[in-house]
Each structure stands twice: as structure tokens, then as C-alpha cells.
Amino acid sequence: MPRTEFPACLIRPREGFYTSEVQAPVGWPLRTFLPTGYEPNYPYPLVVFLHGHGGSDEQVLRLAPRLSRRNYVCISLRGPHAVGVRPDGRPAFSWGGDDSQVEDYVLRAIEDTRRRYHVHSERIYLAGFREGAGLAYRLGLLYPERFGGVASLNGALPRGGPLLRLPDVRRLRVLIGHGIANAVAPLSLARADFRLLYTAGLAVRMRTYPTNHRIHPEMLRDIDRWIMDRINEEV
């Protein structure tokens, strides 16, 4: 597998946002947020942000400092399908349907990040927003051995095909965060997802928020608490 070339500024990593590429098989963007006081000897949890329909990698990675400025290495990826422009005039993207190239892109991006930074192999979390939540679910349930958990924010499980690899998926932790006024993915869908995953034996937690399909600030705080609770349980 070809090795991704990183800019020289990453040789001595400092807090901030960085951009590189993943060859999967062409150059796809990989955006990275490094925490304050990044310590190369500490194995950081990795949070992988997957944007919603009409979003972008650049847009969603802005949320990383609001999740935590210290606790995580964060990356964000870009859906391969252009879907016009956002209200701010910047390009908008979508993940599209079931695409093995997208899966390869995400998995390669994680491996590239692990080669460059000190990431804990059992603390890799997928955080999907709206459409990106469906991709996060799909990856987490197909490859439960690769991930510590999946956070679905205002999204839903993919329908129309088997996903649960019992009993393997029972090791996967899931956090569902959903707006009570979400008309795009109704709250009833999230509740049905919760029941399905709980019945399958997964450690699933659900929170609701006074919002529609947009991200509520408390969602990010709950993701931080959810991940840190798990880390504290392991200590």
C-alpha cells in the first residue's frame, strides 16, 4: 500500500489543523486536528468525523476543539460526491450509497493517522453526523474489531441489508444522539435503532436534545463524556 506523503510541518506536530491526502486509490483529503500539548509518548484516542449530506470535511472538523482541546486526535474525511454549494459558498459533498472505495478510504485514513501519530489501537471512535452516521454504523458493524465505538448524531442505521455480525458486534459501544424535532431522520427511527442494537446485546446509550437535524452543543459534550467514561473503566 503506498505511503501517504505528509507536509513538513507535521514532522514536529503541534496543536492545530493539518491537511494531507490518502491514496485510496486517488488522492482524497485527510484533515487532522491535534490536541493542545500533543505528547508523542501518550496513546491518544482517535475520533473520526464523518460529515452529513451537504457538509464537508473542513466544516465538520471545526467541531473538534469543541469536543475537547486536549483529549483526542481527530480526523475528518470528505464524501466523494459533490452536491452543489453550501450557503457560505463552499462546496458541499455526500457519501452516496454503499461504496467499497469509501470504506477503503476511511480505513486507510485511520492507518495513515496511526503511522504518523500515537493512537491507541482499541480507542478508535467513529462519529457520524446525519448521513455520515449511516456510514459510521456500517463500518462499525462490519468491522467491530477495529473500533471502540460508534457515535450516531441525528442519523440512522442503514436499512435493506444485514449488518450485525453476532456475536462479534457485542464488543462495540454505541452512542445515539438525536434531536427531538428532527424531521429528516425522525426520532422514531433513532428509538427503533436503539431497540434493535440493545436487543442484539450491544452496549448502547441514547440521548435526546432540543433541536432539529442540527448539531446541539451538548451532543459533543456527551461524546466526550461517553469516551472518557469508557477509558476510566479500563484504568
Segments predicted by a language model, with ranges:
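Short, surface-exposed alpha-helical segments at coil->helix boundaries
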Residues: L61, E103, L107, P186-F194
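Cap/lid segment of the alpha/beta-hydrolase catalytic domain
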Residues: G79-Q101
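Short substrate-entry loop that stabilizes the transition state in hydrolases
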Residues: Y38-Y44, F49-V85
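Alpha/beta-hydrolase active-site loop
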Residues: W95-Y117
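Conserved alpha/beta-hydrolase "nucleophile elbow" surrounding the catalytic nucleophile
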Residues: H51, A127-F129, G179
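The feature captures the conserved acid-bearing segment of alpha/beta-hydrolase catalytic domains
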Residues: G149, G155-N232
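Primarily recognizes the serine-hydrolase "nucleophile elbow" in alpha/beta-hydrolase
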Residues: E122-R170
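A domain-start/cap signature at the N-terminus of enzymes
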Residues: M1-L46, G55, R191-R195, V204, ...
